[in-house]
C-alpha cells in the first residue's frame, strides 16, 4: 500500500514538473539587454545586478560574455581582462581579489545562469568568447559551456552566440538542439542554415548593408538579431523590418518604441 502511495506521489510530481516546463513562457518583445541592463540604472556590466535589472524590466533576453580562467572556471566578463588581470592567465581566486564596483565578486557563469533560472521571462544569451591563447582553448570553453548548461538543466533558458564559427559548430556538435547564433557577419543565411545555426546576430551596419538577408533568413526559418543598437532611428528601422531581436545598451528606449 505504501509503495503504491509513493509511486502515485512520484508520478504526480514528475507530471507537475513536466507541465511547468511545458508552460514556461518567455517574453517575446525583441529586447535583448546587452551585458544586462546597466546604463540607465547604473550597474556593472555583466553583473548579477545588471541581470536582475533586465529581468525586472521584462527584457526578452539578457546577454552575457563568458571567458575561462587559467584554472578552468567560466566567468562572466566582457573584456579579456578584469581590472588589469588577463582572465585566461589568472586563476579565479586571483580575480576575486578585485570585486566589481558595486561590491559583487566577479560572477561565474554558473552563478549567472542560476540567477537567471529563478524566473521564466528573460532568456540568457550566452556569448562564448574566442580564446586569445589558442583555438583549442576556445573549443574547451565551448565544451565546458555546454556541459555546464546541461548540468544545470538550463537548456530552455539559454541561447548561445559567438564570434568564432568553430565554437558555434562545437556547441551544435555537443547539443544539436541548442540555439546558436553567429556574430561576425561573414556568413550568408544559407550557410548558417546548412550548418545548423539558429540565426544570425550581426552588427547593425552589416544588417543595413545586407537588408535582403533579413527576408532570406526568415524564409529559411532562421532568426535575425542586430547589435549594438542604441540609436532610435536604427531601432525603428529594425522594427519595420520585423527582426526577431534587437540587442541594445538602451532597453528603455526600445521599450518606449514597442509599447
Regions found by a protein language model. Give the residues of each.
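Bacterial Sec-dependent N-terminal signal peptides
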Residues: 1-25
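Phosphate-group recognition and catalysis centered on beta-loop-alpha active-site segments
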Residues: 20-259
Amino acid at each position: 500500500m505504501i509503495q503504491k502511495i509513493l509511486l502515485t506521489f512520484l508520478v504526480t510530481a514528475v507530471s507537475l514538473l513536466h507541465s511547468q516546463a511545458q508552460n514556461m513562457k518567455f517574453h517575446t518583445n525583441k529586447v535583448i539587454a546587452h551585458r544586462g541592463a546597466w546604463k540607465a540604472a547604473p550597474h556593472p556590466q555583466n553583473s548579477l545586478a545588471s541581470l536582475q535589472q533586465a529581468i525586472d524590466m521584462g527584457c526578452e533576453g539578457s546577454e552575457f560574455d563568458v571567458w575561462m580562467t587559467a584554472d578552468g572556471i567560466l566567468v562572466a566578463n566582457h573584456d579579456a581582462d578584469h581590472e588589469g588581470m588577463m582572465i585566461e592567465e589568472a586563476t579565479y581566486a586571483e580575480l576575486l581579489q578585485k570585486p566589481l564596483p558595486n561590491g559583487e565578486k566577479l560572477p561565474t557563469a554558473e552563478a549567472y545562469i542560476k540567477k537567471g533560472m529563478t524566473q521564466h521571462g528573460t532568456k540568457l544569451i550566452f556569448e562564448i568568447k574566442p580564446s586569445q591563447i589558442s583555438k583549442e582553448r576556445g573549443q574547451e570553453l565551448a565544451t565546458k559551456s555546454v556541459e555546464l548548461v546541461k548540468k544545470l538543466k538550463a537548456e530552455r533558458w539559454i541561447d548561445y552566440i559567438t564570434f568564432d564559427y568553430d565554437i558555434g559548430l562545437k556547441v551544435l556538435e555537443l547539443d544539436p538542439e541548442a540555439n546558436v547564433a553567429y556574430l561576425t557577419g561573414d556568413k550568408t543565411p544559407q550557410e548558417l542554415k546548412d550548418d545548423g545555426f539558429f540565426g544570425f546576430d550581426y552588427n547593425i551596419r552589416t544588417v543595413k548593408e545586407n537588408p535582403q538577408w533579413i527576408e532570406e533568413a526568415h524564409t529559411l526559418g532562421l532568426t535575425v538579431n542586430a547589435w549594438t543598437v542604441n540609436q532610435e532611428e536604427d531601432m525603428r528601422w529594425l522594427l519595420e523590418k520585423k527582426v526577431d531581436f534587437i540587442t541594445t545598451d538602451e532597453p528603455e528606449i526600445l521599450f518606449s518604441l514597442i509599447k
